[in-house]
Amino acid sequence: MTIMRKSHPLLKIVNHVFIDLPTPPNISGLWNFGSLLGMCLILQILTGLFLAMHYTSDTLTAFSSVTHICRDVNYGWLIRYMHANGASLFFICLYIHIGRGIYYGSYLYKETWNIGILLLFLTMATAFVGYVLPWGQMSFWGATVITNLLSAIPYIGQDLVEWIWGGFSVDKATLTRFFAFHFILPFIIAALAMVHLLFLHETGSNNPLGIMSDCNKIPFHPYYTTKDFLGVILLLLLFLSLVLFFPDKLGDPDNYMPANPLNTPPHIKPEWYFLFAYAILRSIPNKLGGVIALVLSILILALLPYLHTSNQRSMMFRPLSQSLFWILVSDLLLLTWIGGQPVEPPFIIIGQLASILYFLTILVLLPMAGLIENKLLKW
């Protein structure tokens, strides 16, 4: 008689994904972030669902409803801060997950990688529309500035912006549709995450050495279920420390003021996880050029499989590429800092140089390093 988990139509799927999945024996803690992203998504959907029960998507009452959640709803303050900081946790895990993919050459699984890029775009869209919902000063002006960027698109730009706004400015119609988008997008992300996993399990996981490990794979359970569970516990510990001790550390003080279309904040900036892209956008004086650079800063990831020149998959034994990878990470941290600074010297030139270095590293330096390493190894 076969075991039920191996024969039952539904349990069979779960079994193939979480129990009997053949997994490389040497994957490190950096491979935990996929499951941690799943945990973050579930956390965000659950906290978001409870917030949606008390939130009203109307310009007159949106700000008050968030205040009501924090003051009058049982543990509303906790749910609200878990949701707000959960977005930061999500992006920390997401960026580490992408960084691991670049470092160990996981982008060579093209289908999985491209679905991942689509997931990144959708997550960024979800976070952006969600940031508008509390209807504070930075919410309102952030929505105005970022949606206005679409007006740079030739010919249809202005019509497109007014179509998204549902009027001639960011108003009630905009808030209502942003709430609708913010509610539905996480479920689309969850469905795409399943497709992401489906494509990954077609090829099997990569490993730090970047070599085939079919001959010595081990079952996912109990080895990696235990390892993932440890990751979840550690991350929740850090996350709850942030939520309970420093809930407003990553937020903007301007969002504690209700949205006022007649008063512009001195420095409009998005949440910290978008600052690197915002810095790239601002580094180009031309509006359309800035928008193109902004989109390309993320879309450039899709080129990585085609820019891979090394005969080795992973960067584990490629010191030249490793150095460039850490230069790229440092550059992104620099761009994140610049994105939060006002547009004045010396920040303008630093932002422009950091933006050039970002594109130069990915498009030119990393492929060149791969070729040089091949030459040095006489491959």
From Swiss-Prot:
Cofactors required: heme b
Residue sites binding a ubiquinone per the record: 201
Parts of the chain that traverse the membrane: 33-53, 77-98, 113-133, 178-198, 226-246, 288-308, 320-340, 347-367
Cofactor binding note of this UniProt entry: Binds 2 heme b groups non-covalently.
Gene Ontology BP annotations: mitochondrial electron transport, ubiquinol to cytochrome c
GO CC, one annotated term: mitochondrial inner membrane
PANTHER family linked: CYTOCHROME B
Subunit structure, interactors included: The cytochrome bc1 complex contains 11 subunits: 3 respiratory subunits (MT-CYB, CYC1 and UQCRFS1), 2 core proteins (UQCRC1 and UQCRC2) and 6 low-molecular weight proteins (UQCRH/QCR6, UQCRB/QCR7, UQCRQ/QCR8, UQCR10/QCR9, UQCR11/QCR10 and a cleavage product of UQCRFS1). This cytochrome bc1 complex then forms a dimer.
Family: Belongs to the cytochrome b family.
Additional remarks: Heme 1 (or BL or b562) is low-potential and absorbs at about 562 nm, and heme 2 (or BH or b566) is high-potential and absorbs at about 566 nm.
Name the UniProt record assigns to this protein: Cytochrome b
Source lineage: Eukaryota, Metazoa, Chordata, Craniata, Vertebrata
